[in-house]
Amino acid sequence: LLAMAQISFDNQKYAASRKYFYQYLENARHTPASLWLGILLENRSGNKNRVASYVVLLKGKYPDSVEAALLKKMQDSGQL
């Protein structure tokens, strides 16, 4: 489901991506990849509270991940 959410996001099918993402969360724990996708999805929809929650989780649980580095770049560039 996470892969389908990512593919949908990459194809700019954001509603489908959110659907797959939330179905994924019903059955799985967050990974760096799921937190990153959650940040992107929620940032796109303007949900600042969820973005902030996912940012805290990503930085706290996976500070050395590729996704945390992507987050830092996004924050440094002012995109988040």
Where are these regions (language model features)?
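"A position-specific structural signal for the A-helix of alpha-solenoid helical repeats
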Residues: 1-3, 36-37, 74
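Alpha-helical adaptor scaffolds
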Residues: 1-26
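Intrinsically disordered, glycine/charged-rich N-terminal periplasmic/extracytoplasmic linker segments
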Residues: 8-9, 36-37, 70
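Register position in tetratricopeptide repeats
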Residues: 10, 44, 77-80
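Short, structured secondary-structure boundary patches
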Residues: 14, 39-40, 72-74
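TPR/TPR-like (Sel1-like) alpha-helical repeat modules
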Residues: 22-32, 36-66
